[in-house]
């Protein structure tokens, strides 16, 4: 039960991601995904969402995969994948998915046992509903409409009403309920009705958690949604402008370090592939072992621009 995650340090090996569905809306990698990273639904993930979440605590990046499966050569397959810079407040490009249908990061919305045990959850909580319309409200950047009659856009935030009595519930559930009063919960995917998401932990009392299902939707209120974006009014703007992408040397012996430099404006984050992955700043050192074409991916809320150097 729940969506698992793994924490790695900055020395975790980078591996390639092979995209099977939404590659054009994904970050290209490589990504530091361990061969034994837990998949949502393990040990029998079946045909579920198969999310894989990786926190790089050395470089402060979050990597999330949807529809993930590992390969014997260490690479991974994924329907989609996104990297999140934990040192900045970024968003996916408008109309782009992430590893979640709303285009949001998954991990920040999960309920973790350690938070509950500490007595305080300080963030909104991820939840699902069976149906949604083809619309989104910030912070969502993507929709997955499956109903023309549903009034619910991706990114909708519900808040537990202030007068809801939490005292009949256990101390742990009161922590969750108080967070729902203060921060609310954000619609992030189509799924089970009013389903809150958390991380697996043997310390959870699942019987106690099931008591949350007694709470009716009428106990919540919708936080004002403005603006609501549909296909007719998606925000428009310019993707990043890359003015240069160069290498310090164009011909070197195998294994010799080369510095890639770039100048760009308007980018929220960068990914250099192959070999590098997500990176901050305007330069990075690489050590090619053969003739290699490097691609700079510069992304903001309006799209992605690329440049190459060989």
Residue ranges with predicted function:
Residues 272-274:
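Conserved aromatic beta-strand anchor motif in extracellular beta-sandwich/beta-rich domains
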Residues 238-247:
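Proline-enriched interdomain boundary motifs that mark the N-terminal boundary
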Residues 263-269:
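Short proline/glycine-enriched turn/loop motifs at strand-loop junctions of beta-rich domains
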Residues 250-256:
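Short, solvent-exposed loop/linker segments at the N-terminal edge
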Residues 1-237:
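Short, surface-exposed polybasic-aromatic patches that bind anionic ligands, especially phosphate groups
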Residues 277-295, 301-302:
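Solvent-exposed segments in extracellular or luminal domains encompassing
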Residues 305-310:
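C-terminal edge beta-strand
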């Amino acid at each position: 039960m729940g969506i698992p995650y793994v924490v790695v340090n900055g020395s975790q090996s980078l591996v390639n991601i092979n995209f099977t569905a939404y590659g054009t809306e994904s970050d290209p990698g490589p990504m530091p995904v361990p061969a034994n990273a837990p998949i949502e639904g393990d040990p029998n993930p079946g045909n579920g969402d198969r999310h894989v979440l990786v926190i790089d605590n050395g470089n402060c990046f979050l990597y999330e995969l949807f529809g993930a499966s590992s390969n014997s050569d260490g690479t991974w397959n994924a329907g989609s994948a996104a990297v999140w810079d934990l040192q900045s407040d970024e968003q996916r490009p408008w109309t782009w998915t992430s590893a979640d249908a709303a285009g949001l990061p998954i991990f920040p919305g999960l309920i973790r046992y350690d938070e509950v045990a500490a007595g305080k959850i300080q963030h909104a909580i991820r939840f699902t509903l069976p149906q949604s319309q083809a619309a989104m409200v910030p912070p969502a950047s993507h929709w997955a409409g499956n109903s023309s009659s549903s009034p619910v856009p991706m990114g909708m935030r519900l808040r537990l009403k202030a007068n809801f009595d939490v005292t009949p519930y256990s101390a742990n559930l009161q922590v969750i309920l108080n967070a729902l009063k203060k921060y609310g919960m954000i619609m992030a995917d189509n799924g089970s009705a009013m389903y809150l998401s958390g991380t697996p932990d043997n310390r959870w009392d699942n019987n106690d958690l099931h008591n949350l299902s007694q709470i009716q939707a009428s106990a919540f209120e919708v936080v004002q949604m403005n603006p609501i974006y549909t296909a007719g009014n998606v925000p428009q703007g310019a993707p990043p402008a890359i003015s240069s992408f160069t290498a310090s040397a164009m011909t070197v012996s195998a294994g010799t370090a080369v510095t890639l430099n770039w100048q760009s404006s308007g980018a929220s984050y960068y990914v250099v592939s192959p070999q590098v992955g997500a990176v901050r700043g305007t330069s990075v050192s690489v050590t090619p072992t053969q003739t290699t074409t490097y691609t700079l991916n510069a992304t903001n809320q309006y799209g992605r621009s690329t440049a190459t150097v060989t």
